[in-house]
Amino acid sequence: MITLLSPSKKLNFKHQDAVSAFTQCDFIESAQELINQAKNLTSQDLKDLMKISDSLANLNKERFNNWSLPFNQDNAKQAILAFDGGVYSGLQAETFDQNDLEFAQDHLRILSGLYGVLKPLDLIQPYRLEMGTKFENAKGKNLYDFWSNEVTNNLNKNIKKHENKTIINCSSNEYFNVINQKNLEGDILNTVFKEYRDGELKFISFNAKKAVSYTHLTLPTTEY
């Protein structure tokens, strides 16, 4: 069983957590290809492409310019600890022990516009490149064209290692759409988190992102 998450726009690179284990992204060379192209864009190009403010465009221009290999714990951070949005606040990965981290490493994947698909302990450097960005590249007109085959094949390779071949989709449509579902060798379970309010079930975005269920889906104490 594998659970899929979207990345977070909010990042935390201000301090390093006490986790020494790390891995490298499976598609670091492909990420480098996108970075090389992104480095040729101006701040105005990024503003127009990503529909972001001047300050964010300048920040991400700086991030792209500073992005460099090889990754190590001095210049990068594990993905599960670097992402800091609502989902990851609810996940509370900073509290994971060694067994929890190992289980998450096998059962959790994070879809990414820059890195394709990440294991929790994969090192990343700061970036912003959403999957839905219409970023033309050598493979097509957007990031779906760039990543679809690689991400789908990677998930198929990993799900074959599991007895339970269910893929639990907790990612957004923007990210899940990168997967070629017709070629996916696993059963897909889509999730929607709602709350009972005022006599009916409602989708509350902030609380849904912090759903404790994410923790239940990734820790080895979970009963399937």
Regions found by a protein language model. Give the residues of each.
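Internal, well-folded beta-alpha domain core
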Residues: A93-L217
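Glycine-rich nucleotide phosphate-binding loop and flanking beta-alpha elements
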Residues: L11, E174, E223
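Active-site helix-to-loop segments that bind/position phosphate- or nucleotide-bearing substrates
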Residues: L4-T95
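Single conserved hydrophobic/aromatic residue that forms the stacking wall/gate
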Residues: H216-Y224
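A generic "cationic amphipathic patch" detector
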Residues: A18, K47, I124, Q181, ...
